[in-house]
């Protein structure tokens, strides 16, 4: 049986630090991968995951429907819209290239499964710099992005509230209390018959949507407004047996396997 092809786009960054030691100082640069918990959770599963880090996605995310069509599900996680709009040919040389946000919309409309996972450069993101608001990708999502910084920082933590039917395929095999999360992106649920809010923040934290499922054309879309790893999603959540089950269920649903 063929595996479900999944493309994860984003979840990488480079940090630069200056270390001061009395009179002296030196610099260091560190490369980070943020999707390792998900990569590990899918090892040996029915899903074949290709991981396209943010810096590679700028010029390697396909520019054609044919290139995207090899995948059943595409995940956008912690990567801003500019990374897919400002290809070097555009940014450095003033040339035209296909608009990959429109391609992702059309690919989803034709039957693909599109997922956006939260983070500092997801939805609208920190300082509003993720910039997915009013884009073709936002058209596909079951939620609308805010036009400004949308972060919900909750250092005391919160436990998700299940708001949808526990019989939904995304909840299959997940039992008991969910672990604590530390933040999410604030979004607005679209008022459509196909959209279902499956989980939310507790009312004391605003009751904002956490897990939302919907349809776009012949495709399916999912918004998970928290992260897939630290810091918003702590290691206690990663180590929870429901973590791997949740993401396998989400991918199965988005790919229309269930």
Regions picked out by a protein language model, each given a short descriptive name:
Residues 1-77, 117-124, 214, 235, ...:
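Aromatic-Pro/Gly-enriched surface loop or interdomain linker
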């Amino acid at each position: 049986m063929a595996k479900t092809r999944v493309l994860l786009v984003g979840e990488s960054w480079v940090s630069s630090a200056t270390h001061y030691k009395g009179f002296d100082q030196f610099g260091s640069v560190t490369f980070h991968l943020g999707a390792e918990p998900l990569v590990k959770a899918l090892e040996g599963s029915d899903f074949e995951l290709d991981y396209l880090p943010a810096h590679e996605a700028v010029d390697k995310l396909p520019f054609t429907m044919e290139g995207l069509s090899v995948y059943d599900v595409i995940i956008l996680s912690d990567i801003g819209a500019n990374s897919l709009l400002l290809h070097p040919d555009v940014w450095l040389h003033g040339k035209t290239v296909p608009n990959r946000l429109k391609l992702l919309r059309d690919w989803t409309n034709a039957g693909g499964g599109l997922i956006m996972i939260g983070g500092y450069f997801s939805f609208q993101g920190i300082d509003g710099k993720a910039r997915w608001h009013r884009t073709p990708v936002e058209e596909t999502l079951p939620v609308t992005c805010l036009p400004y910084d949308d972060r919900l920082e909750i250092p005391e933590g919160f436990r998700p509230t299940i708001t949808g039917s526990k019989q939904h395929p995304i909840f299959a095999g997940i039992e008991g209390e969910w672990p604590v999360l530390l933040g999410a992106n604030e979004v607005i649920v679209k008022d459509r018959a196909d959209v279902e809010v499956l989980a939310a923040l507790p009312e004391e934290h605003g009751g904002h949507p956490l897990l939302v499922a919907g349809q776009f054309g012949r495709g399916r879309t999912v918004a998970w407004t928290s992260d897939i790893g630290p810091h918003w999603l702590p290691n206690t959540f990663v180590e929870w047996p429901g973590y791997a089950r949740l993401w396998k269920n989400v991918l199965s649903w988005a790919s229309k396997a269930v």
